[in-house]
Amino acid sequence: MNIETLFPLDPNVKVRTRFAPSPTGYLHVGGARTALYSWLYAKHFNGEFVLRIEDTDLERSTPEATAAILEGMEWLNLTWEHGPYFQTKRFDRYNQVIDQMIEQGLAYRCYCSKDRLEQLRNEQEASKEKPRYDRHCLNHQDRSINEPHVVRFKNPQQGSVVFDDAVRGRIEISNSELDDLIIRRTDGSPTYNFCVVVDDWDMGITHVVRGEDHINNTPRQINILKALGAPIPTYAHVSMINGDDGQKLSKRHGAVSVMQYRDDGYLPEALINYLVRLGWGHGDQEIFSREEMIELFDLHSVSRSASAFNTEKLQWLNQHYMRTLPAEYVAKYLEWHMHDQAIDIANGPTLTELIPVLSERAKTLKELATASRYFYQEFDAYDEKAVAKTFKLEAEQPLTMLWEKLTALVDWNVENIHQAMNATATELGIGMGKVGMPFRLAVTGSAQSPSMDITAKLVGRERTLARLQKAIKFIQAQS
């Protein structure tokens, strides 16, 4: 049977993988990990990565879900050489192959009614038999093709299907366990299992990486590929991702959508690094650059066991990348969160100045944006607990002296601000904390912030001096 290639199949490309999500919802972390493993394996061998949208479920597939999947892939920077291809645009191709299979005796029309099939199932279950089609229509082909019917694949009845799964090892399924699969529905639409086979064939897919929930589909698909005379890809079925309670990961464990992690303030590098380690590793190494992942990744090293999603580990990785990636790069992602929280970044320090200062304390970009508010806009009130502890009458004198020294500064820089704080403490004969704590509360409104010399530098001269005066008046009014 002729191959209809969608693109020139370069004979020099030894590995071509694919990611084939169904657009019935967002791109979840399980799908993202599958995409990542497929992408890494292709890149490891200088191969090609194909993106395919399996949208044959017309009732549940939506353009919004497709857009969300593409957005998630682009955010993760999982680029593809070919695609995205849509199965709904290839129905003519699938039906062409099905018609050829009927002509060659590889498939047949089935006219059995739902009532007959239900009766057959009931009889088989009553006899403790595995429910399966009895091939009633295989030799009854005198019906009109205009009558309602489905098309079934004529599955081999003898022998077994054996394949070497790259993750799970050798798997063998007896053909007696397999049914004559419906490959075209009554309405003329091809079924999922058949579309996948033709797509993998036409697209020259050499390795299929997917979730373990597809294992039962594999022997059926292999038999169809064999019947078509098509090459059999290497299959790799990865285990599920569970929550930290051992149950299948779901919304109750927190975010499961890739874009929700973006909205929650995670960098794509952190999520990619975390996902690659959910089932694969290289010794005790935890931090992997993308280049290292490509160099080291191997499907045969992927664990067969389910992985547990640990948000704390992801946060640790995210904080690492917030601190170590170039501030200019992190700023591109932080800007979205600043805008989302209605913080005008034109009214304060540059994000590249801010990131090194706040990334030590924040676990996510969302937290960092929230913590940065006092750098860009005025706050309405002081932290009440900090006021009771810090804004006592004795704080007025150090704040007043500090204000005087800061006002006299010619150059507003970290070193000069620090010297002004030191001089205030020395001249008043008090500890640095008696200066720093009320200074912090006055300028930030809270009891926690980075070092006050750096904080005041970034807050700016005018804003810092005005807040000091406001705090002095507040203390005077309290006493």
Swiss-Prot record:
Q: Known InterPro entries for this protein?
A: aa-tRNA-synth_I_cd-bd, aa-tRNA-synth_I_codon-bd_sub2, aa-tRNA-synth_I_CS, aa_tRNA-synth_I_cd-bd_sf, Glu-tRNA-ligase_bac/mito, Glu/Gln-tRNA-synth, Glu/Gln-tRNA-synth_Ib_cat-dom, GluQ/Sye
- The Enzyme Commission number assigned here is 6.1.1.17
Q: Which GO biological process annotations does it have?
A: glutamyl-tRNA aminoacylation
Indicate which residues form the motif 'HIGH' region. Answer: 21-31
Q: Which reaction does it catalyse?
A: tRNA(Glu) + L-glutamate + ATP = L-glutamyl-tRNA(Glu) + AMP + diphosphate
One Pfam family it belongs to: Anticodon_2
Location of the motif 'KMSKS' region: 248-252
Q: Which SUPFAM superfamilies match?
A: An anticodon-binding domain of class I aminoacyl-tRNA synthetases, Nucleotidylyl transferase
Spell out the molecular function terms from Gene Ontology: ATP binding; glutamate-tRNA ligase activity; tRNA binding; zinc ion binding
User: Broadest EC class?
Assistant: ligase
The record lists ATP as bound by K251
Gene Ontology cellular component terms for the protein in this record = cytosol
Keywords from the UniProt entry: Aminoacyl-tRNA synthetase, ATP-binding, Cytoplasm, Ligase, Nucleotide-binding, Protein biosynthesis
Lineage top rank: taxon: Bacteria
Annotated localization? Cytoplasm
Q: Assembly state and interactors? A: Monomer.
Q: Sorted alphabetically, which PANTHER family does this protein's record hold? A: GLUTAMATE--TRNA LIGASE, GLUTAMATE--TRNA LIGASE, MITOCHONDRIAL-RELATED
Q: Which NCBIfam families match?
A: gltX_bact
Family per record = Belongs to the class-I aminoacyl-tRNA synthetase family. Glutamate--tRNA ligase type 1 subfamily.
Q: What does this protein do?
A: Catalyzes the attachment of glutamate to tRNA(Glu) in a two-step reaction: glutamate is first activated by ATP to form Glu-AMP and then transferred to the acceptor end of tRNA(Glu).
Q: What is this protein called?
A: Glutamate--tRNA ligase
| Species per Swiss-Prot/TrEMBL record | Haemophilus ducreyi (strain 35000HP / ATCC 700724)
